[in-house]
């Protein structure tokens, strides 16, 4: 069956309304990792799958605050919250909020003070740097805009504050209360203070009261507890003729309501599971099986991979659903397909983009039904930040991509509600995902030839679009970018060879990859001609001169928090300022996966610079040195 026919079948079977119903049910649970709310949500997923005819499994991995998975990620400890309240008591009374009325009011893994406590409130700016603590905060609450874990360390651990009250001044919606968490290990829970999160508008009110009244007393009460728990992963599968799988994954965690992030992905995955059953009953036979996973983001995925290393090798492709189905008019987002990874270039993002493009066409293209809405979507350079990143690690080298919408003005707040989701967009993304899974699971020589043509076409369009943008970046950088785009995309096309046994088909894959390299070479020649006629500026290329050859020591994604907490104060504060005050990115997760133990640091920087033109050589060098110092990288002898 041709790809376009499979897309039509998927569009006919997937229901956006059913998907939204599943999302609504999931959004009723307060789904903090390793909490009772997550457990209840996992049981809902498991029970629903059983009703659909699956035989689901509920995997449990210790979440005790001390277990280390894949030699780099310490499991969170279980935590639950029962009730909480925050209010100003003096010099006037102001009710700020209560839990569970505001699900994000309590910082996840806050300490418990069931009888409550009154204390003075001190504004400490970001609260992340020593020079902001101009007065003694011992026994007091601090109001801060910085990262909760860092503020907690500075205010509570180092200075004896009672607790922290966090706000985010960068939120687009000033009345939204952000989701905030700290992640204490087992040996740190006795040092945890109270933690609250408030809206920016509430923070401005407190700041104004402090300015007018001189001092404020606030009352904070949290009834919560830490306990030994589990990271729970729900798994279901439909077997194919081979003991190999296409994996569809979504993270189930995040606080109530967490509709877009990520009840949307989890609910849509249930609908895909339902629709897949129906299509297999009607007409499809699978070579590869299709496996479904619902996980606590990163932590659960890493624990699962650590526990099932052998079976992970049987996964041939991974599609991650993380924040899908939002009404773009409401949230302001664009649906993105996570692109080709520089450290593991594969065909899957190119195929996923084409599938989405076909699924986003008017439904009447396939039938006489209603039109689908217009959709903003794009193929973006590789980004990490979700569970696909665990599988695409060069250690496993599994083709992986994700459908994800970004930005979202309600992201990680109490206003991330089901009302912001669109059944029609859920239908488009669900159809694309289902069609992609079916196509991959029923691969044959004919479909492989079709895939080569599709991937080549998408890759050429991607380069053409970026070529015009590159003209603005100067000849030297444009040449560097083209060099690596040619490398990444040709390797992505040739990765289809791994699925091929027929010699003629394999030859066709290799030929198309070679032709793509020739195409990119022609673009480089065109660039040189533009330079010769003075139509493009010249620029100085950034460089890092470091001949060391370094390799990873961990079989997991980089845990930056683990690195920062082990650095000397001055070095730690450099990264804190860079990331959380200047709000710059340095792609630490991508950089880590580029270290293969074969190339010089100079060459790793060059490839990362080609991926991200704003790469800063000094920050890159500092990061590399920090990773060596903390044992995440080691020098090859």
Model-inferred region functions:
Residues 2-8, 13-17, 21-138:
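Noncatalytic luminal/extracellular "stalk/propeptide" segments of secretory-pathway proteins
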Residues 505, 583-637:
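Long, charge-rich, low-complexity alpha-helical segments
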Residues 557-589:
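Short alpha-helical segments that sit at the start of domains
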Residues 16-25, 32-37, 47-56, 79, ...:
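Catalytic-core environment of secreted peptidases
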Residues 422-498:
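Charged, amphipathic alpha-helical linkers/stalks
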Residues 97-194, 257, 261, 589-592, ...:
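Extracellular/luminal Protease-associated
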Residues 79, 101-131, 183-262, 271-289, ...:
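Soluble metallo-hydrolase cores and metallopeptidase-like ectodomains found primarily
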